[in-house]
Amino acid sequence: MTHIEIRHAMDPVSARQLDTAGLREAFHMADLFHEGEIRLVYTHYDRMIVGGAVPAGAPLVLDEVKPTGTASILDRREMGVVNIGGPGTVSAAGETWEMGRGDVLYLPMGAGPVTFAGQGRFYILSAPAHTAHPARLVTLADAKKVKMGAPETANERTINQFIHPEVMPSCQLVVGYTQFHGGSVWNTMPAHVHDRRMEVYLYFDLAQHARVFHFMGEPSETRHLVMKNEEAVVSPPWSIHCGCGTGAYTFIWAMAGDNVDYRDVEPVAMEDLR
């Protein structure tokens, strides 16, 4: 069974007026991972689709997604799949890939229906595409690793880049995940914005009662959302996106937009945050 929700884009002036419930309705994504189901959120931020598939013993097939207006989801799109669960398989275009926890699979435009099987918990990301690049499974060992931060600022972390220009080609999808060193809890701090790309975060590896306080909004009008394990949040191009956890966590970041340059950002000075 496939469930699809649509999220319309919002401008920063309107977002300033929202209360907590309104912010969560507009930007927060809960309940993406349900056993025996595919759950998708079609956003109007660069037409990014975000979702989860949990086969739970029976294969799940992702094919037609009506909001895309095509017969099959990958007719004019590319896709990234991250396994945050147990061992599983993903099949498309006559090939099957074995995916362990933390593996990332890239599927190109034209790959046809996608089948998820096994014990995986598959996080799905899809953006419009203009050409077909080769499908590729990227393991953590294959990813490019960038170390940032320091223990003194509680933000020492390793940024693992998977679907990324320095690892493999894609049309506009950029995907990776960030792991923290012991005692560090701040992500993407100092903050930045990138007006040419949207971004979406999925927080996972959180303990049951742990939370991440995710900060968003214009630098001069910040707000926060409280995130649990396996919850996602969409970041508009005009918004900062950073967070602080009450304990250890990992987060997947994914972007789509005008370019795939990870360094194309506008830093925000601490004195400009409100």
From Swiss-Prot:
A molecular-function term among this protein's GO annotations: 4-deoxy-L-threo-5-hexosulose-uronate ketol-isomerase activity
Keyword vocabulary terms for this entry: Isomerase, Metal-binding, Zinc
Ligand binding (Zn(2+)): 192, 194, 199, 241
Top-level taxon of the source organism: Bacteria
Cofactor mode of binding and number, as noted: Binds 1 zinc ion per subunit.
Cofactor(s) in the UniProt record: Zn(2+)
Biological-process GO terms, alphabetical: D-galacturonate catabolic process; D-glucuronate catabolic process; pectin catabolic process
General function of this protein: Catalyzes the isomerization of 5-dehydro-4-deoxy-D-glucuronate to 3-deoxy-D-glycero-2,5-hexodiulosonate.
UniProt similarity note: Belongs to the KduI family.
Name recorded for this polypeptide: 4-deoxy-L-threo-5-hexosulose-uronate ketol-isomerase
Species of the source: Cereibacter sphaeroides (strain ATCC 17025 / ATH 2.4.3) (Rhodobacter sphaeroides)
Organism taxonomic ancestry: Bacteria, Pseudomonadati, Pseudomonadota, Alphaproteobacteria, Rhodobacterales
